[in-house]
C-alpha cells in the first residue's frame, strides 16, 4: 500500500496525495506559480523563502535538474505541491531528478493532488497558511496550529549574504545589495563587463559610498518590504549620489524610501507569462514575476517618482523612475530564469544611465 501525505490548509480543507521529497514536514504560506518550465530556477529562487509552491503545470521534473541552473546555492522554500512529479526525466544536461533534489535539501512535497482546485482556492480567497502531515489523525491539530501560528514576514536576514564578495568583471564597478538575489542578476551584469561586489542587505549608505561604485543594484528578495527598514535608510543615503536600479523587492524598497506605501496582494504574481505595458512606448512585454506585495499607486502622488510600467492584468505598478535623479526600478524580473527575455534590455539601460551620469559628473567637474 502506497504511503499517503496530506496537504492541510488553515481554512480547514485538506488534500490527500503521495509524498515526494523530504520527510521533514514543514508549514508555510501556500502560493501558486503558473510557469510551464523553469521549475529548477523557481525552487531555488530565494524570493520563495518560507513558502510552499503549487505548480499549476501538471507535470513537473520531466527534464531533470542540473548543477548549473540554480538561482541560489541552497533552496529555501518550505515545500512543493504538484499534480505529477516525473521520476524518469530525460535531458542531456540532467544530473538528478526533481525528487532527489527535494530530498537533498530537505524540502517536502506532495503529488497526486488536484492543483487546479488548490489554485482556484488561492485565487478566490487569497494566500493561505498550509502544512504537510503523513498522518490523517493529525489533520485537526495541524489546522489548529495553522490558524494560530504567525509566519515570519522578514526572511531577508535568512537569505542575504553574510559578508561581501566579488564576481569579477573588467568594466564598470557595481555594488549588488543582496536581499535574496538570483544568480542570473550577477550573470547579466558580468555579461556586460561589470565588476560586481555583492554586499549584505544591511550595508549602510556610507559603506557603499566608500566603495566608490559606478552603480548600485538592489536585488529581489522575500517577504514584506515594510519590514526591511535598514535598506530604506540606505537607499535614501545613496539616492542622487550613485545611479541605481531596483528589481522586485529592490523596487518596492526604492518606492518606500520616497514616501510611497506597499500592500499585500490577494494572491500575487508568480509565473513567467505576465504582460507588462511600458507607458512611454506603449509596448507590451511578457515578464517573469514573483511577488506577493506591490506598491500602492495612489501613494505615489506626492513623491518624486513616476510610474513607467503597469501590469496589464490588474493595473498594478510594475516600474518606477525618479523624475530628476538617476534611479529606476521594476517589479518584475528582467534577468528572467525562468521566463522570457523581453526585458533584458533594462540591464543595458542601467549601464547607459551609469555612463551618462559619469559623463555629466566629468563635465561638471571640468
Curated annotation (Swiss-Prot):
Pathway(s) the chain acts in: Amino-acid biosynthesis; L-arginine biosynthesis; carbamoyl phosphate from bicarbonate: step 1/1; Pyrimidine metabolism; UMP biosynthesis via de novo pathway; (S)-dihydroorotate from bicarbonate: step 1/3
Entry function: Small subunit of the glutamine-dependent carbamoyl phosphate synthetase (CPSase). CPSase catalyzes the formation of carbamoyl phosphate from the ammonia moiety of glutamine, carbonate, and phosphate donated by ATP, constituting the first step of 2 biosynthetic pathways, one leading to arginine and/or urea and the other to pyrimidine nucleotides. The small subunit (glutamine amidotransferase) binds and cleaves glutamine to supply the large subunit with the substrate ammonia.
Keyword annotations from UniProtKB, A to Z: Amino-acid biosynthesis, Arginine biosynthesis, ATP-binding, Glutamine amidotransferase, Ligase, Nucleotide-binding, Pyrimidine biosynthesis
Summary of subunit composition and partner proteins: Composed of two chains; the small (or glutamine) chain promotes the hydrolysis of glutamine to ammonia, which is used by the large (or ammonia) chain to synthesize carbamoyl phosphate. Tetramer of heterodimers (alpha,beta)4.
Source organism of this protein record: Staphylococcus saprophyticus subsp. saprophyticus (strain ATCC 15305 / DSM 20229 / NCIMB 8711 / NCTC 7292 / S-41)
Recorded superkingdom: Bacteria
Designated name of the protein: Carbamoyl phosphate synthase small chain
Reaction equation(s) it catalyzes: hydrogencarbonate + L-glutamine + 2 ATP + H2O = carbamoyl phosphate + L-glutamate + 2 ADP + phosphate + 2 H(+)
Domain Glutamine amidotransferase type-1 residue range list: 173-360
Entry EC no(s): 6.3.5.5
PROSITE patterns: GATASE_TYPE_1 (PS51273)
Major enzyme class: ligase
Gene name per UniProt: carA
CDD domains xrefs: GATase1_CPSase
Amino-acid biosynthesis recorded as keyword: yes
GO molecular function, one term: carbamoyl-phosphate synthase (glutamine-hydrolyzing) activity
List of residues binding L-glutamine: 47, 221, 223, 249, 252, 290, 292-293
Region of interest (CPSase), ranges: 1-170
PANTHER family: CARBAMOYL-PHOSPHATE SYNTHASE SMALL CHAIN, MULTIFUNCTIONAL TRYPTOPHAN BIOSYNTHESIS PROTEIN-RELATED
Amino acid at each position: 500500500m502506497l504511503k499517503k501525505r496530506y496537504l492541510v490548509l488553515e481554512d480547514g480543507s485538506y488534500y490527500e496525495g503521495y509524498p515526494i521529497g523530504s520527510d521533514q514536514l514543514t508549514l508555510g504560506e501556500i502560493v501558486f506559480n503558473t510557469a510551464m518550465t523553469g521549475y529548477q530556477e523557481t525552487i531555488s529562487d530565494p524570493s520563495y523563502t518560507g513558502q510552499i509552491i503549487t505548480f499549476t503545470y501538471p507535470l513537473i521534473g520531466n527534464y531533470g535538474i542540473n548543477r548549473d541552473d540554480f538561482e541560489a546555492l541552497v533552496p529555501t522554500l518550505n515545500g512543493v505541491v504538484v499534480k505529477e512529479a516525473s521520476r524518469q526525466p530525460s535531458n542531456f544536461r540532467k544530473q538528478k531528478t526533481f525528487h532527489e533534489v527535494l530530498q537533498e535539501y530537505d524540502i517536502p512535497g506532495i503529488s497526486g493532488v488536484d492543483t487546479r482546485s488548490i489554485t482556484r482556492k488561492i485565487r478566490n480567497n487569497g494566500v493561505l497558511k498550509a502544512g504537510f502531515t503523513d498522518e490523517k489523525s493529525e489533520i485537526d491539530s495541524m489546522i489548529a496550529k495553522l490558524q494560530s501560528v504567525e509566519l515570519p514576514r522578514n526572511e531577508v536576514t535568512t537569505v542575504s549574504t553574510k559578508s561581501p564578495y566579488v564576481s569579477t568583471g573588467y568594466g564598470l564597478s557595481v555594488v549588488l545589495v543582496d536581499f535574496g538575489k538570483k544568480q542570473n542578476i550577477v550573470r547579466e551584469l558580468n555579461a556586460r563587463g561589470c565588476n560586481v561586489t555583492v554586499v549584505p542587505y544591511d550595508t549602510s549608505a556610507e559603506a557603499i559610498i566608500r566603495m566608490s561604485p559606478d552603480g548600485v543594484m538592489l536585488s529581489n528578495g522575500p517577504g514584506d518590504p515594510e519590514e526591511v527598514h535598514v535598506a530604506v535608510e540606505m537607499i535614501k543615503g545613496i539616492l542622487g549620489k550613485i545611479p541605481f536600479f531596483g528589481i522586485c523587492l529592490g523596487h518596492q524598497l526604492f518606492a518606500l524610501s520616497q514616501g510611497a506605501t506597499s500592500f499585500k496582494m490577494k494572491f500575487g504574481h508568480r509565473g513567467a507569462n505576465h504582460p507588462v505595458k511600458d507607458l512611454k512606448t506603449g509596448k507590451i512585454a511578457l515578464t517573469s514575476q514573483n511577488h506577493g506585495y506591490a506598491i500602492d499607486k495612489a501613494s505615489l502622488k506626492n513623491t518624486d517618482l513616476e510610474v513607467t510600467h503597469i501590469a496589464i492584468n490588474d493595473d498594478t505598478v510594475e516600474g518606477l523612475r525618479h523624475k530628476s535623479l538617476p534611479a529606476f526600478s521594476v517589479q518584475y524580473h528582467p534577468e528572467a530564469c525562468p521566463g522570457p527575455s523581453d526585458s533584458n534590455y533594462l540591464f543595458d539601460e542601467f549601464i547607459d544611465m551609469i555612463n551618462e551620469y559619469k559623463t555629466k559628473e566629468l563635465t561638471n567637474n571640468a
